């Protein structure tokens, strides 16, 4: 992208430019979610004939050392508000693959998430830090399976817009103050440009930030509250257009008749 093209985008409304940058920031995690969908489909397609899901769940618990029961799977499906019990079980298969890639303890460590996203376990990455922090709801430096399900479900087409807006807000709220500050947005924009190998002049980046805060910071206190962010996103939906992956809904629709007839104990 050259400066003249970017300047034209800015002249026509920098919210579109910011939206493109925000979408670019989500590309690595979108790739992971796409991998989740593909792996889930493969889990269903390769299921041995006549093998009950109860048997598969028991195998999974033995291999991972976990104790997921049918009730736990059902509860996670209910919490997600979009995945079926069968899909949660399939996602558990993928979760285990990621969680044993470096440390085989049934939990996803930051290095394992980095390996899944960027094919390397080393190196500093602001985007990785933010994604890991958002996935790690308990703030115990690992991603547990229920946290994994919660994060993936945000991208489902049936997930309420409010949840998607909240996720995107927290992505930019680097210091977790409950507000998006200019420097935080700048850090994310610069990190996104570096990852995308897109070059923009410092003046153009500042102009994008100026326009964004002019539109979003309605009370002019040099920071964007959650309410202001919601209003901004509703006005400029391109900012979170990549927060919905139709393939997640396709996965749900692809297996509507698969009955989870399990005999695992509650």
UniProtKB/Swiss-Prot annotation:
Listed SMART domains: EFh (SM00054)
Keywords: Calcium, Metal-binding, Repeat
Residues engaged in binding Ca(2+): 217, 219, 221, 223, 228
GO biological process, one term: calcium-mediated signaling
GO MF annotation: an example: kinase binding
Positions bearing the site annotation: Involved in dimerization: 196
Family matches, as CDD domains: EFh
InterPro entries: CNBL1-10 (IPR045198), EF-hand-dom_pair (IPR011992), EF_Hand_1_Ca_BS (IPR018247), EF_hand_dom (IPR002048)
Membrane-spanning intervals of the chain: none
Induction: By cold and drought stresses.
Keyword tRNA processing: no
Gene3D superfamilies associated with the record: EF-hand
Quaternary structure annotation from Swiss-Prot or TrEMBL: Homodimer.
Similarity-based family: Belongs to the calcineurin regulatory subunit family.
Protein purpose: Acts as a calcium sensor. CBL proteins interact with CIPK serine-threonine protein kinases. Binding of a CBL protein to the regulatory NAF domain of a CIPK protein lead to the activation of the kinase in a calcium-dependent manner.
Name of the featured protein: Calcineurin B-like protein 10
């Amino acid at each position: 992208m050259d400066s003249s093209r970017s300047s034209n985008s800015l002249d026509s409304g920098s919210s579109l430019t910011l939206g493109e940058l925000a979408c670019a920031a989500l590309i690595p995690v979108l790739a992971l979610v796409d991998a989740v969908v593909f792996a889930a489909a493969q889990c269903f397609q390769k299921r041995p004939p006549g093998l009950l899901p109860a048997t598969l769940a028991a195998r999974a618990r033995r291999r991972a050392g976990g104790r997921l029961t049918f009730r736990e799977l059902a509860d996670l499906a209910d919490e997600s508000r979009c995945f079926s019990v069968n899909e949660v079980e399939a996602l558990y298969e993928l979760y285990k693959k990621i969680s044993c890639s470096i440390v085989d303890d049934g939990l996803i460590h930051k290095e394992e998430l980095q390996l899944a996203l960027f094919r390397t376990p080393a190196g500093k990455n602001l985007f990785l830090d933010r994604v890991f922090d958002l996935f790690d709801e308990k703030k115990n430096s690992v991603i547990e399976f229920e946290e994994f399900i919660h994060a993936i479900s945000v991208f489902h087409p049936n997930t309420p817009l409010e949840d998607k807006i909240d996720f995107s807000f927290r992505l930019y709220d680097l210091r977790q103050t409950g507000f998006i500050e200019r420097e935080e947005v700048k850090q994310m924009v610069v990190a996104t440009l570096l990852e995308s190998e897109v070059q923009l002049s410092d003046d153009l980046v500042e102009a994008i930030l100026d326009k964004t805060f002019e539109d979003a910071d309605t009370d002019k206190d040099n920071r964007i509250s959650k309410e202001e962010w919601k209003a901004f996103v509703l006005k400029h939906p391109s900012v979170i257009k990549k927060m919905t992956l139709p393939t997640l809904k396709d996965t749900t629709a692809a297996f509507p008749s698969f009955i989870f007839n399990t005999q695992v104990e509650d």
